[in-house]
């Protein structure tokens, strides 16, 4: 795990719990955990953590044949190998706050309202989604350190947008012409 970032002249140094690693250039792409490193670089990027919840009901996948969204209750249910996954609540809650039992209860209540009697749920989960106030990711060089690049803040679309964002940032590092105006994604927009 990366504990700190420092510099050997202009070269970034990642300090882990076991060693120090010096690089010519680095990309901070740690999702919701990126803020812990950007704060150490004196960049005030207002990254927050959007926490999305779900619960699983085991051996209930036979109740539905396809995903269903109940917009009037703000919930969705998807049959999966593990059973039924119930989703539909999100909050800004940071990385350290405990899971909200009231949000879990809301998901369970919605599932039972929609499908009737269900067995006890199998597990509870929440995921950390890196979110910025303008809903745009941060991509590009640090405003303070030319050998540090950023690629984070994709909200719940990280799995979708991560690969193309990674390609764009790697092109920037290689000084390739991207033919894109990347100013809206700069970390400087917050300073």
Regions found by a protein language model. Name each.
Residues 143-191:
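C-terminal lid/capping helical subdomain adjacent to the catalytic/cofactor pocket in oxidative enzymes
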Residues 1:
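Conserved acidic residues
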Residues 14-17, 153:
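Short beta-strand segments that buttress and anchor functional surface loops
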Residues 4-7, 11, 20-21, 25-146:
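Active-site substrate-recognition segment that forms the wall
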């Amino acid at each position: 795990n990366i504990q700190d970032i420092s510099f050997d002249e202009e070269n970034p140094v990642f300090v882990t719990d076991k060693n120090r690693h010096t690089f010519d250039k680095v990309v901070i792409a740690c999702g919701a955990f990126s803020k812990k490193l950007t704060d150490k670089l004196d960049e005030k990027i207002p990254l927050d953590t959007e926490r999305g919840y779900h619960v699983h009901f085991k051996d209930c996948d036979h109740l539905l044949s396809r995903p269903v969204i109940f917009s009037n209750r703000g919930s969705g249910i998807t049959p999966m190998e593990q059973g039924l996954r119930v989703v539909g609540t999100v909050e800004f809650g940071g990385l350290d706050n405990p899971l909200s039992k009231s949000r879990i209860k809301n998901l369970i209540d919605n599932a039972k309202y929609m499908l009737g009697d269900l067995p006890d749920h199998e597990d509870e989960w929440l995921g950390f989604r890196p979110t910025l106030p303008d809903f745009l990711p941060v991509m590009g060089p640090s405003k303070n350190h030319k050998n540090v690049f950023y690629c984070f803040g994709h909200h719940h679309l990280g799995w979708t947008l991560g690969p193309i964002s990674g390609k764009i940032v790697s092109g920037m590092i290689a000084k390739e012409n991207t033919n894109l105006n990347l100013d809206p994604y700069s970390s400087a927009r917050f300073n």
